[in-house]
Amino acid sequence: MAELKGNKYGTHRVIEPKGVLTQAAWKIDNDMSKVYSNEIVCDVTSLNIDSASFTQISEACGGDEKKIGEMILGIVAERGKQQNPVTGSGGMFKGVVAHIGEDLKNKPGFDLKEGDKIVSLVSLSMTPLKIDKILAIHKDIDRVDIVGKAILFESALYAKMPDDMSE
């Protein structure tokens, strides 16, 4: 993986419009083959979609799980992130750390290692996301189980999941 240095807030991934932060951007770069030295790549296992966003998507799709999945895939393909264009909201993800950029590995106080289970504490509306496959949609809890990847920027907040915590 290429190890370029990116902006700690992720502005290097903004495609449109230039000059804004990732949350305000319409489209961000979710190319997972291009990883920066101050980014964390995670294998994503589930998305917890913001309740207002999930409700809007579900209603627009008549509650049909296949259509809900297609709409989510479409949003991410178009925008590079899960940010509902109607509500503006995102959610958070759960996953496993797959790669840590070189600049972060030696950063004082950095406590992650590859293989750690984490939850993101920053919105999906600002997180580069690539979905390879939707495995299940849990309408009762606004959760979508996926196979995919996400990038956390140097400034991102996250929480490690304790080993004894149930999924």
What are the functions of these language-model segments?
Residues 1-2, 11-13, 84, 142-148:
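Intrinsically disordered, low-complexity boundary segments flanking structured domains
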Residues 2-24:
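OB/S1-fold single-stranded nucleic-acid-binding modules
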Residues 19-26, 50-54:
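Short N-terminal binding/cap micro-motifs at the start of the first secondary-structure element
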Residues 20-22, 36-38, 91, 152-155:
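A short, polar/charged loop/turn motif at coil->beta-strand junctions and beta-hairpin connectors
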Residues 33-48, 59-124:
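Glycine-rich beta-strand-centered segment in the early N-terminal region that forms part
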Residues 52-57, 129:
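Cytochrome P450 core scaffold surrounding the K-helix E-X-X-R motif
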Residues 91, 117-167:
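NAD(P)H dinucleotide-binding glycine-rich loop of Rossmann-like/cofactor-binding domains
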